[in-house]
Amino acid sequence: MIISMNQTEPAQLADGEHLSGYASSSNSVRYLDDRHPLDYLDLGTVHALNTTAINTSDLNETGSRPLDPVLIDRFLSNRAVDSPWYHMLISMYGVLIVFGALGNTLVVIAVIRKPIMRTARNLFILNLAISDLLLCLVTMPLTLMEILSKYWPYGSCSILCKTIAMLQALCIFVSTISITAIAFDRYQVIVYPTRDSLQFVGAVTILAGIWALALLLASPLFVYKELINTDTPALLQQIGLQDTIPYCIEDWPSRNGRFYYSIFSLCVQYLVPILIVSVAYFGIYNKLKSRITVVAVQASSAQRKVERGRRMKRTNCLLISIAIIFGVSWLPLNFFNLYADMERSPVTQSMLVRYAICHMIGMSSACSNPLLYGWLNDNFRKEFQELLCRCSDTNVALNGHTTGCNVQAAARRRRKLGAELSKGELKLLGPGGAQSGTAGGEGGLAATDFMTGHHEGGLRSAITESVALTDHNPVPSEVTKLMPR
């Protein structure tokens, strides 16, 4: 924010209001600005508005003119928006927070509760869920409070001003970089399946690098955020307002420093990730399409052709959905802030509302990610169903009716029995018999579990026709080495 000294024009306030600041005899700037909400409010990688310079002029102890009652009420209640929008924004943010927190919590529990889910690639999804959970529980509530407040609502601790801004940026950077890492990892696994697969230690190292990079990208906010206290004119003090008003501002060393950082954030947090995600998933689409074509020629069953075509269509829809949802979610907020930084228009209530809507669209990614990376993954969906329907295998429904829990319990018993039978059958097959079940070379990669990066060759297809193997009952070690990775 720019503070201009010794100017005579009145300061521009929200909703067209004006209030003059004043300079003391010692030439230190004292001013009161009705609201610089988006200057003092940083929502992570994206910044909001740089308002015009705060102008100061002489103001006597009683004020140069009477203040509007609405303006006085906003100061006394520390509200930047009127009641209708105030309650609507709280409700809309509340819905996002609840659904986002619930979905991401399910993902975290699903990975932690069972060892079989703690794979190297699931760590990326776990990391994304943790960052999105922080978006829901930290970034959104803090941002909502700052949007609704006319001045800094969190007391006089300057470290809190710096930390909150950096934490908001950190969560968004981690979320978008994690999405990019997931896309790149899937590209490597599916397009280059013969390369060494990612190990657990390697995945942990990459995740540590993601957090370190995000922390580095967010660190300028910790450096340049400052908490300042402005003296309140006597007129407002007489009606009960505190002696000083706190603002958490960005104090960049140059006038355009904030604009440059906004450009940098736009590139790192939006343009580069959307480019990588789009290119990676387009490459995956082409690879899967070529595999399906090869296997379709070799397939002897019309039903198998239909099933592979259905799976390919589902995968294509998922690929397109991930890229589009990511782009659409973050586009409004990034370009709103870029436009606002260039225009430096006075902040009004309508601008605050537009900003809040763009911000909620961006934060909606925290709600969609558990669906795209969790529910659409067969492994995670089964875990979600078990978490949401915790019942024992012997649970008996009331009134003698069968419930969904009973059905799931029976299904789990069948899967367990199938796994035991499959182990016996595979031992009878032996290495030679197992090898004969493959579809042969690249053609054997008939279908790909896109969400996990595991391939299904002719061997697994042959097995699953007789015995239902699930992700909780993986292929035994006797034949794992024969399957392409």
From Swiss-Prot:
Transmembrane segments: 92-112, 123-143, 164-184, 203-223, 263-283, 318-338, 356-376
Disulfide bonds: C161-C248
Disruption phenotype: Increased NPF or NPFR activity dominantly suppresses PAIN-mediated food aversion in postfeeding larvae. Deficiency in NPF/NPFR signaling causes decreased alcohol sensitivity and overexpression causes a hypersensitive response to alcohol sedation. Controlled functional disruption of NPF or NPFR neurons rapidly triggers acute resistance to ethanol sedation.
Presence of the UniProt keyword Nucleus in the record: no
Gene Ontology BP annotations: G protein-coupled receptor signaling pathway; larval feeding behavior; multi-organism reproductive process; neuropeptide signaling pathway; olfactory behavior; response to odorant; tachykinin receptor signaling pathway
Protein origin, superkingdom: Eukaryota
Tissues in which the protein is found: Expressed in midgut, brain lobes and ventral nerve cord of larvae. In adults, expressed in a pair of dorsolateral neurons in the protocerebrum, and the central complex and a small number of neurons in the subesophageal ganglion (at protein level). Expressed in a subset of sugar-responsive PAIN neurons in the thoracic body but is absent from other peripheral PAIN neurons.
SMART domains to which the protein is assigned, alphabetical: 7TM_GPCR_Srsx
Cellular localization per UniProt: Membrane
Main location per the UniProt record: membrane
InterPro entries in the record: GPCR_Rhodpsn, GPCR_Rhodpsn_7TM, NPY_rcpt
Keyword Transmembrane found: yes
Topology in the lipid bilayer: Multi-pass membrane protein
Alphabetized UniProt keyword annotations: Behavior, Disulfide bond, G-protein coupled receptor, Membrane, Neuropeptide, Receptor, Stress response, Transducer, Transmembrane, Transmembrane helix
Signal peptide range in chain numbering: none
PROSITE patterns: G_PROTEIN_RECEP_F1_1 (PS00237), G_PROTEIN_RECEP_F1_2 (PS50262)
GO-annotated molecular function: neuropeptide binding; neuropeptide F receptor activity; neuropeptide Y receptor activity
Cytoplasmic topology ranges: 113-122, 185-202, 284-317, 377-485
PANTHER family with a match to the protein in the record: NEUROPEPTIDE F RECEPTOR, NEUROPEPTIDE Y RECEPTOR
Function noted in UniProt: Receptor for NPF. Integral part of the sensory system that mediates food signaling, providing the neural basis for the regulation of food response; coordinates larval foraging and social behavior changes during development. Required in dopaminergic (DA) neurons that innervate the mushroom body for satiety to suppress appetitive memory performance; a key factor in the internal state of hunger in the brain. NPF neurons coordinately modulate diverse sensory and motor neurons important for feeding, flight, and locomotion.
Protein name as it appears in the record: Neuropeptide F receptor
Organism: Drosophila melanogaster (Fruit fly)
